[in-house]
């Protein structure tokens, strides 16, 4: 089946423009993307005209509450939209469709962004499209890297899933049974009072590079799924013994050297990433694929990419794909891109069907724009 992506091209135009708004967590992103007519390919790539982002950052040891995050988004959304349009050198009347994150995510921040999206759609009298946050990550990753039909490892603050495409759905082959990997890293960063700027997970990554002693932690893989709450509880307990009132010194049995905070970050990363590599490799075998695409904020972690690369090298013609922080970390351009793909196949939302949802499964989305 060949999908017609130009059925809804406006008369006299040879391209499409979409504005995307992302605000499912603490990052507010607005992006403008351009698709030329015809199917996207290696010779007809989507063009990123602007990709502006602002992050709500809290003090060390604190997370971000939905109410405060939503206030940040409301305060900044108009300025970010204006900046995105100015960077793209276009006006509102040039936009074909408004795209917004419909879920999953934090309720209050999502609601702040959808209000802005509805306002723009009515102000400029153009269609509006709700986008699944995960599908946005996948489609942007595929477009930027050129990955054809990879197994997708989606790792972020709110999601951890192993995904593969089949029959116009992104099927979930494995996922976390409790907390997401980004949540696990962020919460441990709060335990250690690690700064939240530019991001707690990034700061843990930098500390882990200085670690060299592996502290034993639970390793919880259950078939294709994994659990991280027990690992977090275990390493939190160790950290509180070391840096709390007890000031207990832990010694590495092999070297006789003291365990440091850097060693804890190193141990947490190595354990979590080993679990992710295991279930991803199992999915590759199941669908007979040799490509892995890593998306989501944690996907920019260099150690995760390195470990995945070591695994994929053992497979014939194995390839790993990942983007940099511009596209791995939550952004508006991925929402614009996925939303524009929906728009080009005639999928739009009526205003009364733009309600956000905190629970929005990846496999709920009908991927109409891909050939079956």
From Swiss-Prot:
InterPro entries attached to this UniProt entry: ATPase_NBD, Gcp-like_dom, KAE1/TsaD, Kae1_archaea_euk, Peptidase_M22_CS
Cofactor note: Binds 1 divalent metal cation per subunit.
Binding site for a divalent metal cation: 133, 137, 154, 330
Location in or out of the cell: Cytoplasm; Nucleus
SUPFAM superfamilies: Actin-like ATPase domain
Family matches, as Gene3D superfamilies: 3.30.420.40
Single GO cellular component term: nucleus
Cofactor: a divalent metal cation
Oligomer status and interactors: Component of the EKC/KEOPS complex composed of at least BUD32, CGI121, GON7, KAE1 and PCC1; the whole complex dimerizes.
Name this protein carries in UniProt: tRNA N6-adenosine threonylcarbamoyltransferase
Gene assigned in the entry: KAE1
């Amino acid at each position: 089946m060949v999908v017609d992506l130009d059925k809804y091209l406006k008369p006299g135009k040879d391209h499409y423009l979409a504005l995307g708004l992302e605000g499912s967590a603490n990052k507010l992103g607005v992006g403008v993307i351009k698709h030329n007519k015809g199917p996207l390919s290696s010779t007809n790539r989507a063009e990123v005209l602007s990709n502006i982002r602002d992050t709500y950052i809290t003090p060390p040891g604190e997370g971000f509450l939905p109410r405060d995050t939503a206030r940040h988004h409301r305060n900044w959304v108009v300025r970010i939209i204006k900046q995105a349009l100015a960077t793209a050198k276009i006006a509102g009347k040039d936009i074909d469709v408004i795209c917004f994150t419909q879920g999953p995510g934090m309720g209050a921040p999502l609601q702040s962004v959808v209000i802005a999206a509805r306002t723009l759609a009515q102000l400029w009298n153009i269609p509006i499209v709700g986008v699944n946050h995960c599908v946005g990550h996948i489609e942007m990753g595929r477009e930027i890297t050129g990955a054809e039909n990879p197994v997708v490892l989606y790792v972020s603050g709110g999601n951890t899933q192993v995904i593969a495409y089949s029959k116009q759905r992104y099927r979930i082959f494995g996922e976390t049974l409790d907390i997401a990997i980004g949540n696990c890293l962020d919460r441990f960063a709060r335990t250690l009072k690690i700064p939240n700027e530019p991001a707690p997970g990034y700061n843990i990554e930098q500390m882990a590079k200085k670690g060299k002693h592996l502290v034993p932690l639970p390793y919880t893989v259950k078939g294709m799924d994994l659990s991280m709450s027990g690992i977090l509880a275990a390493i939190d307990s160790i950290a509180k013994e070391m840096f709390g009132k007890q000031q207990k010194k832990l010694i590495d049995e092999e070297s006789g050297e003291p365990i440091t905070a850097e060693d804890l970050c190193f141990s947490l990363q190595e354990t979590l990433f080993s679990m992710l590599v295991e279930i991803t490799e199992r999915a590759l075998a199941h669908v007979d694929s040799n490509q892995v695409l890593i998306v989501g904020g944690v996907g920019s972690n260099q150690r995760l990419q390195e470990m995945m690369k070591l695994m994929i090298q053992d497979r014939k013609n194995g390839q790993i794909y990942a983007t940099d922080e511009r596209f791995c970390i939550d952004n508006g351009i991925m929402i614009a891109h996925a939303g524009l793909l929906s728009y080009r196949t005639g999928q739009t939302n009526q205003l009364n069907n733009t309600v956000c949802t905190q629970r929005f499964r990846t496999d709920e989305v009908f991927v109409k724009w891909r050939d079956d």
